[in-house]
Regions:
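Second-shell loop/turn segments in exported
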Residues: 43-54, 97-99, 108-117, 127-128, ...
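An amphipathic alpha-helical core segment
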Residues: 165, 169-210
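Bacterial N-terminal signal peptides that target proteins for export
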Residues: 1-7
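A cross-kingdom marker for long, charged
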Residues: 29-33, 204, 211-243
Length: 243
């Protein structure tokens, strides 16, 4: 009887030890699995895969964005990104139109947008280089986050550098299409009006910022399309990362 009890007790101890060992093994296996992200089509994704996929989506966005915005009416014909006069020049537009000089205002606004369309052609290499050189911190979080998360990350991390590189391109386009001349015409006309506060916004800075705004809007649209529309995932990497 004592032998039977001892045997039973020993067996229980062995079973418990075996079970704990199996449990530890199971926990390790599960832990290894949850360190990676899974998608229906790709299996496991590494941080490097996700980073490369986000960069590819952004590169595609700028390529399509440049193609769209550099067309005639790319800026001027799109109400979402059409460049108006600066907010601090609202009184200029209102006053000049009331004095019958609306055509000068219209010409200034149109030439401002034509300059942005012309400058867009020179944006591609500048933006693509910024994307390639971008270090994506916490790529997994960006992937799982907002539909424009990669675009917002790009803007936050590269906008200042993009502005400095893109500004000379915009300046050249402003001069090329006559926007600088038209800008000076309306503000000179306004500043000659008696009793008005003189206004003279910085054309190059304003135009560069607004042109960049339009490009980021287009990049965000492409990112959204890639995330939501499987047909937009035209490469193996995009299919792997975005499912």
């Amino acid at each position: 009887m004592k032998k039977s009890v001892c045997f039973t007790f020993g067996f229980l101890i062995f079973s418990a030890s075996f079970s704990f060992a199996q449990l530890d093994k199971l926990k390790k296996t599960v832990g290894d699995k949850i360190k990676s992200v899974k998608t229906p089509s790709s299996g496991e994704l590494s941080e490097e895969d996700v980073s490369a996929g986000l960069k590819e989506a952004l590169t595609m966005g700028i390529e399509k964005g440049v193609n769209q915005l550099s067309k005639p009416n790319g800026y001027f014909g799109d109400l979402e990104i059409k460049i108006p006069l600066p907010k601090d020049a609202a009184n200029v537009e209102t006053k000049l139109r009331s004095l019958g000089q609306g055509q000068k205002v219209d010409e200034a606004i149109e030439s401002l947008n034509r300059a942005a369309e012309d400058a867009a052609n020179g944006a591609k290499d500048i933006f693509v280089d910024a994307i390639k050189n971008m270090t994506v911190v916490d790529a997994m979080s960006i992937l799982r986050g907002e539909d424009n998360g990669a675009t917002k990350y790009l803007e936050k991390s590269t906008r200042a550098a993009l502005f400095e590189k893109f500004k000379p391109v915009v300046k050249s386009s402003l001069d090329k299409v006559g926007a600088t001349k038209n800008w000076n015409t309306i503000f000179t006309a306004y500043n000659k009006i008696p009793m008005v506060e003189k206004v003279n916004p910085n054309l190059e800075e304003y135009a560069t910022n607004k042109a960049i705004d339009g490009l980021f809007i287009q990049i965000a649209k492409e990112e959204l399309s890639i995330r939501k529309n499987s047909a937009a995932r035209v490469t193996d990497l995009l299919k792997k990362v975005f499912g």
